[in-house]
């Protein structure tokens, strides 16, 4: 699967770890940055190009990181056809529902909150869970205005 990935300085180390993990699993990873640590960088500079890339390729997904993942999801969701969901811990069912009911195509995670040892299971789950379709399709269509 083609996966776009992006972060600001807050998630740089975790992004690099996730990128290596995904590549080892055979995914094609497009890294939109950040590529070096700069505590003054701005997350929209990396997140928006990532979200645009996902919006242009319906078969791809995106993983974005930041301190909390909230601002990053807000930025990504400004792009038409993007449905970014935030996860920073808690029940795995939340991640499943983002795919089953919302067809989330970007997973936004809070690097300062999520435990690294749990992140790979969450990513694997999010990548494998299909969209249910059905009654959820009409709801998603109402979002792209």
Predicted regions mapped to residue ranges:
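Short active-site oxyanion
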Residues: 2-3, 59-62, 81-84
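Glycine-rich phosphate/diphosphate-binding loop of Rossmann-like nucleotide-binding domains
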Residues: 5-24
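Short, conserved beta-strand edge motifs with alternating hydrophobic and charged residues
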Residues: 6, 30-33, 62-66
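Short, structured active-site "lid" loops
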Residues: 46-64
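Mid-chain, well-packed structural core segment of small domains
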Residues: 65, 70-108, 112
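A short beta-strand-loop structural module common to alpha/beta enzyme folds
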Residues: 28-40
